[in-house]
């Protein structure tokens, strides 16, 4: 049986904007309360109706297809907004009309009765969320891992499954409408320009991220990068105890090459990352706060060390694809902003970089230092090619390719023994691909075709 939620009951007219992954989860959740349901979606009527029948069966759901209108949505008492919806003017108008506007985190907040770990940042949040989940499971805890990755939080609430800890990846889009969401442990990994097409500028993007801390109390824990000036700014923080992690001497969770350490229960604990998938600069910075979180939730040090040793990285994040004639090929398709690309380049020495795609408003001049220090050839693809060329052509040799296949072929022709060919786009994928996973899979196929040709 669903826990009572002050935002929804049988007398509520509950609307959902956008029937994507989060919207479907919201509909499944709302069906359990017997509310009057409205759905507004951009897809055509036939496709939307098929989705509603599949999800709601015989339950009557009023809907509008082909867009979102004030006239339809203003009937609602409460509106659930999917993270991808960006019409702030419409939402403001609905609020003025007395409609409550909520995101997933705000809707779930009143009924969360287990410790919640919420992880955000421009880069690394998926890896760290997965790692925290693995470390907690290694200690025998029942864990839900989801949010912006995998299973939506509302599906956990619908299921009634009992867990000990909830671990969530949360995005800036979700945090904009977080309401009274208050995680017991909140982690901000890093901040660099991203989604500026949505947030307007870096200040707007940072403000969305800082919602993570605003409702925390004195018994909660806030963990932020001690190396990132944007994370260190205290404005927007709540009342939680704050811990810094990183290479900085001021860090409470101290990171160094191949290991990290922190004080716990009066003892200095040292954790080695040697021979693990996390033994690189990015991995050190990911593992340190993850282990501190697990330790803060009463996991044993030995269990944490076992979880770190067993951890494997997800696809499309600095994923080794092949070694061909002494050249290493890496798929980093998940790198959709400049910060992620810089992090990838810092792990390599002589790089042929494939970058480009759909621009998200990023400043590609931020890549100049890392490109000058690590990249000997840049191959640009996609709509952002002119922007990348303008920002970088005076610090690196630049080529243009009309397809990813052409880019891989060019990279292979330029590469010499000891080089690395890296797909790390700094852009969204939607100009040429279905998503970043599709882009990464196509890159992998092209590279493996090179390997097949070379073996004949």
Swiss-Prot record:
Coiled coil: none annotated. SUPFAM superfamilies: MurCD N-terminal domain (SSF51984), MurD-like peptide ligases, catalytic domain (SSF53623), MurD-like peptide ligases, peptide-binding domain (SSF53244). Gene3D superfamilies: Mur ligase, C-terminal domain, Mur-like, catalytic domain, NAD(P)-binding Rossmann-like Domain. It is found in: Cytoplasm. The keyword Cell division applies. NCBIfam families: murD. Cell wall formation. Catalyzes the addition of glutamate to the nucleotide precursor UDP-N-acetylmuramoyl-L-alanine (UMA). Belongs to the MurCDEF family. This is UDP-N-acetylmuramoylalanine--D-glutamate ligase. It comes from Desulfotalea psychrophila (strain LSv54 / DSM 12343).
């Amino acid at each position: 049986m669903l826990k009572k939620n002050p935002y929804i009951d049988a007398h509520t007219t509950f609307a959902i904007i956008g029937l994507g992954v989060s919207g479907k989860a919201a509909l499944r959740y709302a069906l359990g309360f017997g509310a009057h349901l409205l759905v507004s979606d951009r897809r055509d009527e036939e496709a939307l109706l098929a989705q509603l029948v599949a999800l709601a069966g015989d339950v009557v759901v009023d809907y509008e297809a082909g867009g979102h209108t004030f006239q339809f949505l203003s009937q609602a008492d409460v509106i659930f907004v999917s993270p991808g919806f960006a019409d702030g003017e419409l939402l403001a108008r609905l609020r003025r009309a007395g409609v409550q506007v909520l995101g997933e985190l705000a809707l779930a907040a009143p009924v969360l009765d287990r410790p919640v770990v919420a992880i955000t940042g421009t880069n690394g949040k998926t890896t760290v969320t997965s790692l925290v989940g693995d470390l907690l499971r290694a200690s025998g805890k029942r864990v839900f891992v989801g949010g912006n990755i995998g299973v939506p939080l509302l599906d956990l609430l619908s299921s009634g499954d009992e867990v000990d800890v909830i671990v969530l990846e949360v995005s800036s889009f979700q945090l904009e409408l977080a309401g009274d969401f208050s995680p017991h442990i909140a982690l901000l990994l890093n901040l660099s320009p991203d989604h500026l097409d949505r947030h307007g500028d870096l200040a707007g993007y940072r403000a969305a991220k800082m919602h993570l801390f605003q409702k925390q109390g004195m018994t909660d824990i806030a963990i932020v990068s001690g190396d990132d000036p944007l994370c260190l700014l205290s404005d927007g923080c709540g009342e939680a105890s704050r811990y810094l992690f990183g290479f900085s001497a001021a860090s409470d969770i101290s990171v160094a090459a191949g290991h990290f350490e922190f004080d716990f229960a009066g003892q200095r604990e040292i954790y080695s990352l040697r021979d693990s998938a996390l033994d690189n600069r990015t991995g050190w910075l990911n593992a340190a706060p993850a282990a501190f979180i697990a330790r803060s939730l009463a996991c044993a040090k030995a269990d944490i060390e076992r979880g770190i040793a067993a951890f494997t990285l997800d696809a499309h994040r600095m994923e080794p694809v092949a070694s061909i004639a002494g050249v290493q090929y890496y798929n980093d398709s998940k790198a959709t902003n400049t910060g992620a690309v810089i992090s990838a380049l810092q792990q390599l020495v002589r790089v042929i970089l494939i970058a480009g795609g759909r621009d998200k408003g990023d400043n590609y001049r931020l890549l100049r230092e890392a490109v000058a220090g690590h990249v000997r050839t840049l191959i640009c693809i996609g709509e952002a090619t002119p922007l990348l060329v303008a920002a970088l052509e005076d610090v690196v040799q630049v080529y243009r390719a009309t397809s990813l296949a052409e880019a891989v072929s060019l990279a292979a022709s330029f590469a010499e023994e000891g080089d690395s060919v890296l797909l790390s786009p700094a852009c969204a994928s939607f100009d040429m691909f279905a998503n970043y996973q599709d882009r990464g899979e196509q890159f992998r196929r092209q590279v493996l075709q090179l390997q097949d040709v070379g073996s004949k």
